[in-house]
């Protein structure tokens, strides 16, 4: 994710539809003009994430605060960090669902992303396939031939493969072997040989679908993480009960602007 700070209740990013190819200007004639327009708007709704625990007045009185407090504080930090990982992964977990549309009105991974020209574009295969040599090559070809809304080739490249734990061994064989996997042919592994996924693969333990996998691309303004309020902690006593209460709180949002940031499959 690209991390950015925010000072508002939400953030909106308007995508720009650029210009077409520049035409030849005949001698003595005026230059041609083109119009750049605004595309769809991606919206990031910040969420407040907070959790607290309390120690009784008696526990504090019996000098248990130092022993229990430090352990509870570490557990609280783990809970906050785990929640953030889940929310970050949910952008991919919900990538195929129409219930979580992006700024263009369709799911993050879709076969019919609408373009300003009236055409549609896809960041998935027409038929989902399991992770294998062919599906990797097809995805990398699809990524490299993506165009912008005006039909200009933007020469995207895949950066890394993101897989759940269930696919880590398949991914390792496919991206670590110098030769083709599962064949007796003495052919090179073209993906490895050309360095087409420079960051290799990464295992995301928070992905829900054991068959789904994703290719992150190098398009700008893709996945974004907005920090509205960094992690803050506070400690106070409760007058009525005498308990000591410890709270952790932060505000942030995860999302995406340009859907070309990823290509993916749910598996066959």
Language-model features and meaning:
Residues 5, 37, 48, 59, ...:
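Solvent-exposed, flexible loop/coil residues
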Residues 21, 73, 89-96, 100, ...:
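Solvent-exposed, non-transmembrane amphipathic alpha-helical segments
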Residues 1-49:
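Assembly/oligomerization interface modules of large self-assembling protein complexes
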Residues 18-20, 29-34, 49, 55-64, ...:
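Short alpha-helical interface patches
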Residues 66-71, 78-142:
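Alpha-helical scaffold segments that mediate packing/assembly in large oligomeric complexes
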Residues 42-47, 58, 98, 106, ...:
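Flexible, active-site-adjacent loop/turn segments at secondary-structure boundaries
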Residues 41-99, 161, 246-248:
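Long, contiguous amphipathic alpha-helices that act as assembly "spine/axial" helices in icosahedral shell
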Residues 109-149, 155-160, 166-268:
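Sequence/fold signature of self-assembling virion shell proteins
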């Amino acid at each position: 994710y690209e991390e950015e700070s925010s000072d508002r209740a939400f953030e909106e990013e308007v995508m720009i539809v650029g210009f077409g190819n520049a035409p030849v200007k005949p001698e003595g004639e005026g230059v041609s003009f083109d119009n750049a327009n605004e595309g769809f708007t991606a919206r990031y709704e910040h969420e407040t994430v907070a959790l607290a625990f309390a120690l009784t007045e008696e526990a504090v009185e019996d000098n248990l605060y130092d022993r229990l407090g430090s352990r509870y504080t570490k557990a609280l930090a783990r809970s906050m960090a785990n929640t953030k990982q889940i929310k970050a992964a949910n952008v991919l977990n919900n990538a195929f669902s129409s219930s979580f549309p992006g700024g263009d009105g369709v799911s993050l991974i879709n076969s019919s992303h609408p373009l300003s020209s009236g055409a549609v574009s896809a960041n998935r295969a027409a038929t989902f396939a399991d992770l294998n040599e062919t599906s990797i090559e097809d995805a990398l070809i699809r990524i490299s031939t993506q165009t912008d809304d005006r039909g200009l080739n933007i020469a995207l490249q895949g950066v890394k493969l993101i897989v759940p734990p269930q696919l880590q061994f398949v991914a390792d064989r496919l991206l670590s072997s110098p030769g083709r996997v599962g064949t007796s042919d003495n052919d090179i592994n073209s993906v490895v040989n050309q360095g087409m996924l420079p960051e290799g693969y990464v295992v995301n333990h928070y992905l829900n679908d054991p068959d789904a996998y994703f290719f992150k691309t190098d398009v700008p303004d893709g996945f974004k993480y907005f920090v509205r309020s960094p992690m803050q902690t506070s400690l106070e006593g409760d007058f009525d009960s005498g308990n000591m209460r410890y709270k952790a709180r932060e505000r942030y949002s995860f999302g995406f602007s340009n859907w070309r940031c990823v290509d993916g499959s749910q598996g066959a």
